[in-house]
Regions:
Chain B
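Glycine-rich helix-loop "coupling/hinge" segments at transmembrane-helix boundaries
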Residues: 160, 171-175, 186-187, 201-202, ...
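Short hydrophobic alpha-helical segments within the ABC transporter permease transmembrane module
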Residues: 111-115, 120, 155, 162, ...
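Gly/Trp-centered helix-boundary motif
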Residues: 1-135, 139, 146-147, 161, ...
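Residue-level recognition of transmembrane alpha-helices
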Residues: 63, 111, 153, 169-170, ...
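Generic hydrophobic transmembrane alpha-helix motif, especially the helices
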Residues: 98, 102, 108, 129-208, ...
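Transmembrane alpha-helices
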Residues: 117-133, 168, 172, 222-254, ...
Length: 359, 321, 353
């Protein structure tokens, strides 16, 4: 099972902040007057990963892959259908409501839309201070001080504490959301596309802020995004999801330099690069994403994969460690077989992509 | 293709971010700031609002006048509204009786003034009752969902399918004429519309990320409903409730006109009309004019106020669409 | 994945040098008159477009790029907006002087537009075949049957499989990528000279985005349509454009050929944007990851309270007094490279990777 703790040298024996095993979430589809169940949406279909202290796991995928569902299932905003989720070692799915409430202090979430993630009738200060109020931490005065400190930390002025959300810009609202997530001093913050709705120049500010906070507080992030460049920038490890399953999982550099799964290859090939001198040779995938209600049998990607074989159509490929600490779920990338030249590069750090001028 | 039209909201064209900043950082708050420090007092704020929404100010003034009239009734009338005096029966308006006298010799002015008490008591009573239970039902229905929602909605459907006046009449007839029964009979037809509005707001608010965030920090569902959902449903509710005041006054007048509403001894504009309209409209028109004008102005005032409140509350809600 | 990329030399688009100018916008001003004041959504915008050329207009939200396109097509909501000045010449004819009836003959016929959200831009109760044939019948004298055949032909052109069957389907039965293809088919059905594409791929997944961009480029080359691509994504610009205009606060601040813009920008905003975009390091061979992104401090200004002088001055590292007092003149600093900045000389060579 891919274990982030193995990859990071900083914390060799500590418990991973988040550990997910075979997480599944199936939504029933109800039709008709009697609302009979006619099928399921296999939103998350057996996902496993772990995040170590101070590390960021980037979870990428396109629409319908289930990454947002994973984000919510992992903190029980949605109840998983099955699987195991451990935060700091504790199995949170076995907790009672009261115990879960206390456990929530360890893991918080930031949302994508800066407009709807804040209650429009509460002042910014109230929003940020609410977690403290709910958990009855500190006196009123202490809470005020903590909120002021949080404002300062995320780059807002304490004088803005009494302003309402609509008086802030999108980037500032996102900062309020970050301050709210930090209020309880969690170990893990889940970012559900936290910068996708922001302008490029504001994105950079928020990404920098998140990275600074991580360094300062040794935070762990589960960073969900569809923008590969942003994910590459902020993550330590990256996992790629397709139709409810993780298809590839590796340390960031390894994944981007030598992707092993055809879908990852296709994703990387599709990203437009802001360098007009580099032109793409060809697109590596055609067609549309199948529906998660009726996923294709066997490997979900076989309908669009250039290399699909008969085995791919029948058997679900397991997530295997194809190269050291580089996991892929593809029949064509077996640890033993040597089918693709790209695989040989997986064990060697491709130095050609490293040499570059510093920023 | 659907190109934007003149109905397309600006923030969809220019871009939410700086439209929100433009629309808010200036209009209300900047004007407020420009108005100066004295606006921080409550009177200052009231004057500022009156300047910005003149019609609403008029509406508010009318409502306030009626409330004052109702409250100060004993002090502004010189005659007992129930005292009969056959000698001055059907007297025209004069100095002693500014609105004349009815067929029993009762001073019309004091009857109209005390009628305001009745009307307002019923209107406010019915509105408060209707809002209280409507919110309860709507919130529970929208938040809990499932069979609670299904069952409640069907009951609401049934209630709403009957016209307001007919339903009120049926209830009043069943309960019998009295002040409290009138209040109940008027409150019940109000329930469906309020419950519907609250339920609709609740349903959309329930899915909002800020509600998810509240859950993520461990807030109990009850607290979320009170602290996050309910305050955001207030805007349409206030508009509905204020407009409902006018309807309540009208319905009370209608019920009393039909004899099903507020009985003797409480003076009621509606009953005054029914007592005098058919027989005396030509011989003593003041008996019809004054109560009629009172009803008209009262409803007019509440409608103006309701419209202004909607204008005041809605644009600021737009940023959270 | 080095075998997927190849370096291309920055050859000038030689073939379009001799082509004629098909669209010329001069001094376009579109203002919105709202309670708060005047919103100068587009302020003095000028550019020209040659036949078959690919121009990108890039900027962040609220910079006026979408409104420029809507102004060209005269789709500005009036009230509260109005085109207050300028001219838009299509093949020599000033569109702003046409009557509404004449303008209707131009829209969809000589100039077309595709929008960001294909779901809301397609009529949900009409089949896509019917919508495309409607566009054809409006502008060409053909029977309904012929128009429908043309519609199916267009759907095949945009690579929708089983086009004849799909033509009878409704928008909600198609995926996002398909809908965008359908909208492209509708836009190109009458073979327009100019195609305006307003963020056509922003709402799509990245693999679908790549397909749609490829499609637009392929069709553009085949049909000879000039394309104005409006976007905020610099990657899309780099891949598709020959020339780029950068907008900020309703004004054009820089214009150049694409390679030159990316390698030697002359406006601090452009330079800031380029530095703020995280690049896929492995793909573009640039800076190592986990360094801080270069930020542009501050926020995009509200268009109704624009500062005097250069709109970018409050956020600009090079701003001086002259910047705050007067908007800089639009000058040609290098051949084919125009910029509006008092200090562009200082930026020469100061490109951060």
């Amino acid at each position: 099972m891919p274990d982030g703790a193995v990859a990071s040298p900083a914390s060799p024996a500590s418990v991973p902040v988040l550990e997910v095993r075979d997480l599944k979430k199936h939504f029933p589809v109800r039709k008709g007057v009697l609302r009979a169940i006619t099928g399921h949406v296999y939103a998350v279909d057996g996902v496993s990963f772990s995040i170590a202290r101070g590390q960021t796991l980037g979870l990428v995928g396109e629409s319908g892959c289930g990454k947002s569902t994973v984000a919510r299932a992992v903190i029980r905003l949605i109840e998983p259908t099955s699987g195991e989720v451990r935060i700091l070692g504790r199995d949170i799915l076995a907790l009672t409501k009261a115990e879960m409430r206390i456990c929530r202090r360890q893991a918080q979430i930031i949302f994508q839309d800066p407009f709807s993630s804040l209650n429009p009738r509460m002042s910014a200060g109230e929003i940020v201070g609410e977690p403290l109020l709910v958990h009855q931490l500190g006196s009123s005065k202490e809470r005020q001080e903590r909120v002021a400190a949080l404002f300062d930390r995320v780059g807002l002025r304490a004088s803005q504490m009494n302003s309402l959300p609509h008086q802030f810009s999108g980037g500032q609202r996102q900062r309020i959301g970050i301050a709210r997530a930090l209020a309880l001093d969690p170990q893990l913050i889940i970012g559900d596309e936290p910068v996708s709705a922001l302008d490029v120049s504001i994105q950079a500010q928020v990404i920098n802020l998140m990275m600074d906070l991580q360094e300062e507080k040794n935070l762990s992030y589960l960073f969900i995004a569809h923008d590969l460049a942003v994910v590459e920038h902020i993550s330590h490890r990256v996992a790629v999801m397709y139709l409810g399953r993780i298809v590839e999982h590796a340390e960031k550099r390894a994944l981007f330099a030598s992707p092993l799964h055809p879908y990852t290859e296709a994703l990387l090939a599709a990203v437009p690069i802001p360098n007009p001198r580099l032109k793409r040779q060809k697109r590596l995938v055609q067609g549309d994403v199948p529906s998660p209600i009726n996923p294709p049998p066997g490997c979900h990607f076989h309908t669009r994969c250039l290399y699909a074989t008969e085995q791919c159509k029948r058997e679900v490929p397991p997530l295997l460690e194809v190269a050291p600490d580089h996991w892929a779920a593809c029949h064509l990338r077996q640890p033993k077989a040597d089918l693709h030249p790209a695989q040989a590069n997986a064990t060697v750090n491709p130095s050609s992509t490293r040499s570059s001028a510093p920023a | 293709m659907t190109p934007p039209t003149s109905d397309t909201p600006l923030d969809a064209i220019i871009g939410k971010d700086e439209f929100a900043a433009a629309a808010s950082a200036d209009s209300f708050d900047a004007e407020l700031a420009k108005a100066g420090a004295h606006v921080t007092s409550r009177w200052g704020m009231a004057l500022f609002l009156a300047k910005r929404y003149p019609l609403g100010g008029v509406g508010l003034a009318i409502v306030v006048i009626f409330v004052l009239v109702a409250v100060l009734a004993p002090y502004i009338t010189t005659h007992d509204p129930l005292a009969t005096n056959p000698a001055i029966s059907l007297a025209a308006p004069s100095a002693a009786h500014p609105m004349g006298a009815d067929f029993m010799g009762r001073d019309l002015f004091s009857r109209v003034v005390y009628g305001a008490r009745t009307s307002l008591a019923v209107a406010f009573g019915a509105t408060i009752l209707g809002v209280f239970f409507g919110v309860l039902i709507g919130l529970a229905s929208g938040y809990l969902g499932g069979w609670v929602d299904l069952a409640t909605q069907r009951i609401i459907d049934m209630l709403q399918s009957l016209p307001t006046l007919i339903l009120a009449m049926a209830m009043a007839a069943a309960l019998g004429p009295s002040l409290t029964n009138t209040i109940i009979a008027i409150a019940i037809p109000k329930l469906p519309s309020i419950a519907r509005v609250i339920r609709a707001s609740t349903l959309s608010l329930r899915e909002m990320p800020f509600v998810e965030a509240a859950r993520a920090m461990g807030m109990s569902e009850m607290r979320i409903a009170m602290r996050h959902i309910l305050p955001n449903t207030l805007a349409p509710l206030i508009v509905l409730a204020t407009a409902g005041l006018g309807t309540a006054i009208l319905v009370e007048a209608s019920l009393s006109f039909l004899g099903l509403g507020v009985p003797e001894p409480h003076p009621s504009w509606g009953r005054m009309l029914s007592e005098s309209a058919a027989e005396y409209v030509r011989t003593a028109p003041w008996l019809v004019i004054f109560p009629g004008v009172a009803i008209t102005f009262a409803v007019f005032g509440t409608n103006l106020l309701g419209d202004a409140l909607r204008d005041l509350l809605d644009p600021r809600q737009r940023t959270s669409n | 994945m080095n075998n997927v990329l190849e370096t291309e030399s920055a050859d000038a688009p030689a073939k379009s040098a001799a082509a004629k100018t098909v669209l010329e916008v001069a001094g376009l001003k579109t203002y919105f008159f709202v309670r708060q004041g005047i919103v100068k959504a587009v302020d003095d915008m000028s550019f020209s477009l040659k036949a078959g050329e690919k121009l990108a207009i890039v900027g962040e939200s609220g910079c006026g790029k979408s409104m420029t396109a809507l102004s060209i097509l005269r789709l500005v909501p009036d009230p509260p907006g109005r085109i207050v000045a300028g001219s838009v010449r299509l093949d020599g004819r000033d569109l702003l002087k046409l009557s509404e009836a004449e303008m209707r003959k131009v829209r969809g016929n000589h100039i077309s537009m595709i929008f960001q959200e294909p779901m809301t831009s397609l009529n949900p109760v009409w089949s896509i075949g019917n919508q495309i044939s409607e566009a054809v019948m409006l502008h060409q004298n053909v029977s309904r049957h012929e128009a429908f055949e043309k519609a199916v032909e267009m759907l095949q052109l945009v690579k929708i499989p089983e086009a004849a069957r799909r033509a009878r389907e409704y928008p909600h039965q198609l995926s996002g990528g398909m809908r965008q293809r359908a909208m492209t088919a509708m836009a190109l059905a009458c073979n327009p000279h100019v195609l305006l594409a307003d963020e056509p791929t922003t709402a799509l997944d990245v693999t679908i985005q790549a397909q749609i961009l490829d499609l637009i480029l392929e069709l553009q080359e085949r049909l000879g349509t000039a394309v104005v691509l409006i976007t905020h994504d610099l990657g899309v610009v780099a891949e598709t454009a020959q020339r780029v205009i950068v907008m900020y606060g309703g004004k054009k601040v820089e214009e150049a050929a694409v390679v030159e813009l990316f390698e030697a920008p002359l406006h601090p905003y452009t330079q800031g944007l380029l530095a703020a975009v995280p690049h896929l390091a492995a793909m573009s061979g640039l800076a190592p990851a986990r360094s801080r992104l270069k930020e542009i401090p501050g926020i995009v200004p509200a268009l109704v309270n624009l500062p005097k002088g250069c709109t970018f001055a409050p956020r600009c590292a090079f701003a001086s007094d002259v910047c705050r007092n007067e908007f800089p003149p639009y000058e040609t600093k290098r051949p084919g490279h125009n910029v509006a900045c008092w200090h562009s000389n200082q930026l020469d060579g100061v490109r951060h990777a």
